[in-house]
């Protein structure tokens, strides 16, 4: 019966994952107590069968090996779940990293305040597994040197991003579009501020020496660049030059080109506010949003945190009376006792296809007291100091 229920449960999890999300399937099936109990009962039954059917005899060696295999598989699942840790280590070619981002997600809270005249900090870290398809309610009751506060769940949304929502009473923003590595990205430069985009400074109505300064005067827009550039008016394909340190009219919907960087200002400045909105399929930064209620000293503040698996975002800060709270949601950045350099990433495609890849391989260098090269690909795992790296 157990051998029938186990594959049925796994099949159910697969369907739930495709219908809803991976995290929903984990909450309902894979991480549920009943699924773990099912695996535990299976392991106990396999161990009991060894004695019951006298599988330790030479004649039944093949059956013994089969039973032991299942036992070790289930033990491995237990170790991975409760003792091991998983994560992702993103590295660009010719870069080095000594940390990875945890597969598990956490709510991290720093609380700053005074205790007997001395500034103190308390850290809270709570592992969360959330999905917008399940009931995520939780409440964290804590104190900061006998000052009680609580953090409670309000809402959770998947696949969102931060975007500009038009509002006549909002701040003015001008949109810039660039695609340095072939991926389209949109940036909004707030009026009166300076933004760093791909290590190039841009300002909007706030002159900054060494930046590409955009100004608006009586409904007209101007650009002044610290270096020479060219532009192409996309509607007419007419070319023009942008001279260094010369204030010129800004050509909207035109492609500006400087060495190693291309950008477009597609439209005039807009008034609006930045809010969490549903992400489009083409958006590069797709995150989750966790909404919380923070209650302290009889006052409640609502907090919206962007993050999720694979993200380590800056904390969102707020002050309630005499306590400062800094909250973030996402993965942990875990340090390794060694470094890995990615020398080359090789992706091979099936013949005659554009987006169907047949294999991947990473040529890396492990940097520690001893340094060595290694190729990571399918079925060729890098094992080093208790860590296993897969491609």
Task: Explain the meaning of each model-derived region.
Residues 6-20:
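Alpha-helical transmembrane segments of multi-pass membrane proteins
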Residues 17, 69, 150-151:
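N-terminal ordered "arm"
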Residues 1-2:
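N-terminal membrane topogenic signal
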Residues 89-391:
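Soluble non-transmembrane domains of integral membrane proteins
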Residues 31-108, 112:
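Internal alpha-helical transmembrane segments
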Residues 21-30:
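Perimembrane loop-to-helix junctions flanking transmembrane segments
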Residues 5-6, 38-42, 76, 387, ...:
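Short hydrophobic alpha-helical segments that form membrane-spanning helices or hydrophobic packing faces
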Residues 27, 62-64, 381:
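Residue-level marker of motif borders
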């Amino acid at each position: 019966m157990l051998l029938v229920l186990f594959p049925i449960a796994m099949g159910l999890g697969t369907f739930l994952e495709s219908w809803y999300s991976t995290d929903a399937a984990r909450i309902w099936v894979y991480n549920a107590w009943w699924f773990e109990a099912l695996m535990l009962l299976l392991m106990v039954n396999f161990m009991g069968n060894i004695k019951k059917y006298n599988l330790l005899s030479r004649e039944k060696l093949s059956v013994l090996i089969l039973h032991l295999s299942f036992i070790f598989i289930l033990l491995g699942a237990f170790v991975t779940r409760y003792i091991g840790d998983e994560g992702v280590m993103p590295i660009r070619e010719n870069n080095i990293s000594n940390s990875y981002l945890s597969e598990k997600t956490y709510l991290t809270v720093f609380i700053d305040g005074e205790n007997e005249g001395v500034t103190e900090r308390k850290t809270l870290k709570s592992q969360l597994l959330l999905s917008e398809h399940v009931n995520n309610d939780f409440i964290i009751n804590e104190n900061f040197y006998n000052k009680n506060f609580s953090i409670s769940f309000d809402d959770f949304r998947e696949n969102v991003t931060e975007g500009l929502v038009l509002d006549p009473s909002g701040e003015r923003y001008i949109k810039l579009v660039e695609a340095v590595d072939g991926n389209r990205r949109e940036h909004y430069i707030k009026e009166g501020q300076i933004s760093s985009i791909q290590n190039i400074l841009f300002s909007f109505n706030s002159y900054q020496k060494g930046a590409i300064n955009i100004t608006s005067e009586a409904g007209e827009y101007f650009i002044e660049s610290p270096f020479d550039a060219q532009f192409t008016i996309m509607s007419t394909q007419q070319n023009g030059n942008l001279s260094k340190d010369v204030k010129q009219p800004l050509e909207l919907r035109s492609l500006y080109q400087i060495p190693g960087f291309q950008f477009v200002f597609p439209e005039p400045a807009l008034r609006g506010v930045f809010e969490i909105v549903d992400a489009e399929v083409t958006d590069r930064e797709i995150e989750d949003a966790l909404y919380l209620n923070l209650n302290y000293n009889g006052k409640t503040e609502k907090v919206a945190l962007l993050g999720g698996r694979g993200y380590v975002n800056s904390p969102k800060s707020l002050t309630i009376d005499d306590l400062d709270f800094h909250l973030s949601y996402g993965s942990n950045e875990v340090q390794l006792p060694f470094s890995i350099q990615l020398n080359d990433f090789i992706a091979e495609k099936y013949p005659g296809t554009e987006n169907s890849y047949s294999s991947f391989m990473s040529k890396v260098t492990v940097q520690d007291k001893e340094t060595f090269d290694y190729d990571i690909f399918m079925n060729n795992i890098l094992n080093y100091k208790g860590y296993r790296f897969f491609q």
